[in-house]
A protein has these predicted regions:
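Short alpha-helical segments and helix-capping/turn motifs at coil-helix boundaries
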Residues: 7-10, 81, 101-106
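Conserved NAD+-utilizing ADP-ribose enzyme module
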Residues: 16-21, 28-61, 91-93, 102-214
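Short, intrinsically disordered low-complexity segments
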Residues: 57-95, 99
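N-terminal amphipathic/basic-hydrophobic helices that include classical n-h-c signal peptides
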Residues: 1-14
Length: 214
């Protein structure tokens, strides 16, 4: 089922906080839709060592090997959870994006001059192409394992959501950075993460395409 069909059924027909796009954030001088998960360990570690700093963006890379292990374990968890709900992940790893947009992502950009973004319409995806977590998938999995009492919400954390499920949550609660009462520390991502499992659908939105690029 594509989003155009979802809008005409059930909850979505009366949705008043409609969000109909994803945002991919990347460095302007780099190719979009790239992933550390596509690289050999030594290549990924080299990149993380170069990006490591004390900002919310770079601090996660202070132990690059452990980060890579956690990332791959998280991607496997999301992939298996999505498949269990009927998803059809066609790639071994997802391209991560944000549902709607994120002021937090813009604010933590380590180099504003290199910051760029591409908006992808949700209408190109079906239910079997894309999964979601609240918030970032690594944080969601971490919360579900550690269950920190000040942050853990079992109905949201440790859950893999389909397109229709996440839109139902947005219809009920609004968008996290605008409408939710959250006590997440400022260094943790507050957005809804989207995991795109069909990379071929993104080719038309690469550099040189005028749609939604920033």
């Amino acid at each position: 089922m594509k989003i155009s069909q979802i809008w005409t059924t059930g909850y979505a027909a009366g949705m008043n906080k409609m969000v109909d796009y994803l945002t991919h954030y990347y460095f302007r001088d780099k190719e979009p839709f790239m992933s550390l998960s596509a690289l050999a360990d030594h290549e990924a570690i080299k990149i993380m060592e170069a990006l490591c700093d004390d900002t919310p963006f770079g601090t996660r890379f202070k132990d690059p090997l452990q980060y890579l292990r956690n990332r791959r374990a998280t991607e496997t968890w999301v992939r298996e959870g999505f498949a269990a709900k009927g998803g059809q992940p066609q790639a071994p790893y997802p391209i991560s994006m944000v549902l709607g947009s994120s002021k937090w992502m813009v604010a933590i950009a380590p180099d504003r001059d290199r910051h760029a973004e591409i908006r992808i319409p949700l209408s190109i995806f079906s239910e079997t192409d894309i999964s979601f977590t609240v918030p970032d998938s690594m944080i969601s999995r971490w919360f579900s394992l550690e269950k920190p009492p000040e942050f853990y919400q079992p109905e949201l954390h440790g859950q893999i959501f389909t397109l229709s499920e996440i839109l139902a949550i947005v219809d009920q609660k609004g968008m996290p950075e605008l409408d939710w009462q959250t006590n997440l520390p400022s260094d943790l991502a507050p957005y809804i993460e989207a995991q795109v499992w069909r990379h071929d659908l993104l080719k038309v939105y690469k550099k040189g395409n005028d749609y939604g690029s920033g």
